[in-house]
Structures are given as structure tokens and as C-alpha cells.
Swiss-Prot record:
PANTHER family to which the protein is assigned, alphabetical: ARGININE DEIMINASE
Disulfide cysteine pairs (residue numbers): none
SUPFAM superfamilies reported for this sequence: Pentein
Residue stretches in coiled coil: none
Family: Belongs to the arginine deiminase family.
GO molecular function, one term: arginine deiminase activity
The UniProt record lists the keyword ATP-binding: no
Species per Swiss-Prot/TrEMBL record: Mycoplasma pneumoniae (strain ATCC 29342 / M129 / Subtype 1) (Mycoplasmoides pneumoniae)
Record-given protein name: Arginine deiminase-like protein
Length: 438
């Protein structure tokens, strides 16, 4: 790859479109399609999740600092949504989309969804499975079913289960038969728009995979996504790909981190389906090996684009030297799949960014370069900023070192209080999934 020109390729999509079916809701009720041209384009539509009881039912997950105080978390989140709406961004709530999708589908689909949800909840006892299934069937409405799915089912919610076999004995000290969907606050972790298509992300974590079932059914049965192309799905085998490792830095280019959550097979699988779709504007993937930076490090913890030439970075990302370019070809591999051309790039990280944006980048080191401040603001999701438009961002107010530096660069900064929201693993960026940017 030269520093001034990036290769463009065309081809054919290798992954079938989602198995959508005839829907009862009229399509004119919904906008159709998705489109994201870059991380910083004007934000038109998003998916968000209003914090519910699941946010204070975090009792055994090491990813959260602690359970959130629900009332305060809801107020903080409402301020966040208010900023989006004042900007002109349409907000679709996750539970509303799921309700619309299941309402549009056949009754059999709803029953299958409940059963699949229970199967992915890790229930090993037939009696417990039946008790939970009957509990769902006893609820008055689909709205109640969805609320219970997100909030979890406690042992005390169902009638006492009489053990019929040894596997029916409840030996766990957890108060839950089905754990809450505690990560629902972060739609970006599970579902993301890439150009004019979408990706469902692949993980080995059983809890996160259970969350992604919600997005699979929305994708398959909601009129909004009828005909939208799916580039990765939950059925991908023997590979990993995480939304936190993907940054759409321009209309044609994705940056992807090779990490403990995103492996080379996952990147190749995404590349094969995405880059060979000639209707999608994305034509290249730049893969950066970030393994050496730690097991819990994803690319969006190392770099955040905040304007056409401005980036927040963690100092260590400048040490990244193993970088690859992936593009589509017209050839086929021995397995008959579209062949992906790849080559190592002999540029350092800063030179790669300069080549992509075609100008000298301006890097702001998180925390202002102070080692203690950098660690503190990385932990407080200072890198997880959400772009509303070029040079206009939403941030947590507590990251004042970085916020002040961005303010000095002339950025428009919307600060939200985050005494509770910052207890979670992510910032404003992952609290929404962008559906449309322009």
C-alpha cells in the first residue's frame, strides 16, 4: 500500500442474506436499510438500550466494577439520549425493536425464540427448563416476556422444582436460574453496521453469545432489516471477531485489531464476505496485531477517531509494527471460497493513519501523556467517545484531562455524568449501535 493511494477491488458476496420471511407489519412504517460511511459521519439513527433491572443485578461478573444504582444510571442515560435527540439522531430502543420483530413473525418463531433463549442460558436440567418455559408461557404479553428475558429469572420466581433425576438438583449458589442480560446497555458489542451491511459478532463467551441471540432475531424478522446483508453471524465456527476491534476509519477502509477477541480466521471470514460484496463501499481492511498489548486490550481501547484528522490514542499503540492490508480478488481458494489477498505493510502506525486520511494526523494521548492519568482515564472509558459529526463528540465528564485537550483542539464536547454508567466496561461509543451515518 502506498501512502497516497489505497487499492480498490470488487467481487461477489459469499454469505447468504438473512433468512427473512413475509412480515405482517407494513414496511412503510419503518426506514429501510443501513449505512455508515465512517466513525465520524453525521449520526442519524442508532439502537440504544434504556437501563433496566438487569443493570443492578450484576452479582458475579468481573467485567463491571459493581452493580449500578438503577435510578441514577437511568437519569444519566436519559441525559445521553437527550443529547442524541437534540443533535437530530433518531433513537430506536432495543426492546422495542425485538418486540416489533417478534410481533411481525409467526407465533412459532416466538416459541422458538424462547426455547433457544433457554437453551443458550446453560440450563442442564430438563425439569428446570420446563419450569422456566412454563413461566414464560404464563406471562400476559410479549412485552412481559421480553422484560423477563432481560431481567433474568430468579429461583424464587418459579414454583419449587421437585427433582426427578439427579441433574435436577440445584447446587449453584446463584439466585438465578437464568442470569440477566447485563451487557444489554452496550448494543455495539453485538451488532454493528459496516458500510451498507451488518455484522453479528462471534465470541466464545456463553453470556455474550446469549445476548447476541436478540440481535439475530431482530435482524431476521424486523422489517427494517429486510434484505440487509449479513457479513458475520453467530454460526461462524472456529473463529472470533469482536466489534471492539473494528473501526471504520473511512468510507472504504476498516481498521481491525488482531487481539485475544478477534483472530486472523475471524478477520479473513469477515473480509471474504464484506470485501467481495461489490455493493458495499468498504474495499479494504487494515489489520493491526495488538496481542502484545494485553489480553483485555481491544483496538477501540487504543485509538478513537474524533475528527477528520484528530485521534485519541493510548501511547502504546504507536509501538504497533505488525500491520497487514487485505483486499478482495477475483480468484478462488482451493476450498472454492473467494480468495483474499493480503500483504504486510512496511509502515509504522502513524504512517498508516496518514496514508488513510491523506493528511498529517493529530494524536492526543489519553490522559495528556501523564502515565497515572492515562491509566485512570483508560479505566474510565475515556477512549470510548461517540462521534455525532466530525469534531463533535459525546464523552464521560470524569475524563477531564483528555476532555480539556480535545476542547483546546476546538472540538465540540457534550459531557454526560457517569458516576453509575462508568461502572460498566464501555463508554458512549458502545452504548449505541449506529444504523445510519451520512
Amino acid at each position: 500500500m502506498s501512502k497516497k493511494q489505497l487499492v480498490k477491488t470488487d467481487g461477489h458476496n459469499q454469505l447468504d442474506q438473512p433468512n427473512t420471511k413475509a412480515l405482517q407489519l407494513k414496511k412503510k412504517q419503518f426506514n429501510s436499510g443501513v449505512r455508515v460511511t465512517s466513525e465520524i459521519s453525521f449520526l442519524r439513527e442508532v439502537i440504544a438500550h434504556h437501563p433496566g433491572i438487569e443493570t443492578e443485578r450484576v452479582i458475579d461478573n468481573q467485567t463491571f466494577g459493581s452493580a449500578m444504582y438503577l435510578e441514577r444510571a437511568q437519569k444519566e442515560h436519559q441525559l445521553f439520549i437527550k443529547i442524541l435527540r437534540q443533535h437530530g439522531t433518531k433513537v430506536h430502543y432495543l426492546q422495542d425493536l425485538l418486540l416489533e420483530a417478534l410481533s411481525a413473525a409467526d407465533p412459532n418463531v416466538r416459541q422458538d425464540f424462547i426455547k433457544n433463549f433457554l437453551l443458550e442460558s446453560g440450563i442442564k436440567s430438563v425439569s428446570t427448563f420446563e419450569a422456566c418455559l412454563n413461566f414464560f408461557r404464563s406471562l400476559d404479553s410479549l412485552v412481559d416476556v421480553i422484560k423477563v428475558m432481560f431481567g433474568g429469572i430468579k429461583v424464587s420466581d418459579v414454583p419449587p422444582i421437585t427433582p426427578q433425576r439427579f441433574a435436577d438438583i440445584h447446587v449453584s449458589n446463584s439466585p438465578f436460574l437464568i442470569k440477566p442480560l447485563s451487557f444489554s446497555l452496550y448494543p455495539h458489542k453485538f451488532f454493528n453496521t459496516l458500510g451498507t451491511g451488518v455484522a453479528l459478532f462471534v465470541t466464545n463467551d456463553s453470556e455474550l453469545k446469549r445476548h447476541s441471540l436478540v440481535y439475530e432475531y431482530i435482524m431476521r424478522f424486523h422489517p427494517r432489516f429486510d434484505g440487509v446483508k449479513l457479513y458475520t453471524n453467530r454460526d461462524f465456527k472456529n473463529c472470533l471477531i469482536n466489534s471492539s476491534d473494528i473501526i471504520q476509519i473511512s468510507n472504504e477502509i476498516l481498521l481491525i485489531g488482531i487481539s485475544h477477541d478477534t483472530d486472523v480466521l475471524g478477520i479473513e471470514s469477515l473480509a471474504r464476505n464484506l470485501l467481495s460484496d461489490h455493493t458495499n463501499p468498504i474495499k479494504q481492511i487494515i489489520a493491526i496485531n495488538i496481542h502484545k498489548f494485553g489480553a483485555k486490550t481491544n483496538l477501540n481501547k487504543l485509538i478513537a477517531m474524533v475528527d477528520v484528522d484528530k485521534f485519541i490514542i493510548a501511547r502504546k499503540v504507536l509501538q504497533a509494527t505488525e500491520i497487514f492490508e487485505l483486499t478482495a480478488t477475483a480468484q478462488r481458494d482451493v476450498d472454492g471460497l473467494a480468495q483474499i489477498k493480503f500483504k504486510p505493510l512496511k509502515f509504522n502506525f502513524g504512517e498508516i493513519i496518514e496514508a488513510i486520511i491523506d493528511k498529517q494526523p493529530r494524536f492526543v494521548i489519553i490522559g495528556g501523556g501523564d502515565e497515572v492519568a492515562e491509566r485512570k482515564e483508560l479505566l474510565d472509558c475515556g477512549m470510548g467517545v461517540l462521534n455525532l459529526s466530525p469534531g463533535e463528540i459525546v464523552v464521560f465528564d470524569r475524563n477531564h484531562y483528555t476532555n480539556n485537550l480535545l476542547n483546546e483542539l476546538g472540538l465540540i464536547i457534550h459531557k454526560i455524568p457517569a458516576s453509575e454508567l462508568s461502572r460498566g466496561p464501555s463508554g458512549p461509543l458502545e452504548m449505541v449501535c449506529s444504523l445510519w451515518r451520512e
